[in-house]
Amino acid sequence: VTDSQWGFQYSTYVYYNEHCIVFNGVHTPMKIERATFVKLFDFVKLFPHYFLGSNADLPIVGGSILSHDHFQGGHYTFAMAKAPIEQKFEMEGFEDVEAGIVKWPMSVLRTRSKNPDRLIDLGEKVLRAWRSYTDEDAFIYAETDGEPHNTITPIARKKDGMYELDLTLRNNITTVSYTHLRAHETSAHL
C-alpha cells in the first residue's frame, strides 16, 4: 500500500465475514486526507473482493484509535453499500464520475468511476469543502475555538467493474442537550 509496509490481520471480533484490520507499519497518527483515499484504493486494487474504510479522524465521530493509522475492511457487503442513490448530481470538472446522495440516515455521497484516481481527486475536493463548511442554521460549524468539527468517513470498494468511494460527512459537535452523544471520559467510544 503506497509502496510502504502495512500489517494485515483478521479481527478477533469478527463483526462480519473476513473482518480485517490493516495497520500502517510506521507509527503515524490517523488522519483523513488525500493520502487516505490513495491508500484505500491501493488496498482495493490488491484485494478487489474486499471493501476498506477508515473511521473518522476526530473524537466522538471516530470511535477509533486515533493515535495510529489503520483501516478496517472485509469480504462483506453492508446495507449502506446496497442502498440506492436518492439523487444524482454532477460536480464541475468531474463530469466523468457518477455521483449521488445515498438514501441513508446519514449524509453519504457515493462516487463511482473506472478510474480510482478520479475518485481520489473528487474525494479530496469534497473533504476540503466539508472541512471548511459552516451552516449556523443547521448547527454545523467547521470549527469552534480553533477545534475542527467536520471530517469524513471514507469507504472504498470495487463493484461491477467500477471503483466506488462512499464519503460519509461527519460533524462531532455535542451540546448539553445531547449528553448521550458525548464520548465516555475514559474512552473514545460512545
Residue ranges of predicted features:
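Catalytic or ion-translocation cores adjacent to nucleophile or general acid/base/metal-coordination motifs
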Residues: 48-64, 73-127, 131-134
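C-terminal functional module detector
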Residues: 129-132, 136, 147-160, 168-173
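Residues forming anionic-ligand binding surfaces in small-molecule and nucleic-acid pockets
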Residues: 11-26, 105
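Conserved small/polar residues in nucleotide/adenosyl-binding loops
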Residues: 179-186
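Histidine-centered divalent-metal-coordination microenvironment in nucleic-acid enzymes
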Residues: 18-19, 24, 61-78, 168
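Helical scaffold of the NTase/Pol beta-like nucleotidyltransferase catalytic core
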Residues: 27-52
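A short glycine-rich, hydrophobically flanked beta-strand micro-motif that places a catalytic Asp/Glu
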Residues: 50-63, 139-154
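Low-complexity, highly charged intrinsically disordered N-terminal segments
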Residues: 1-3
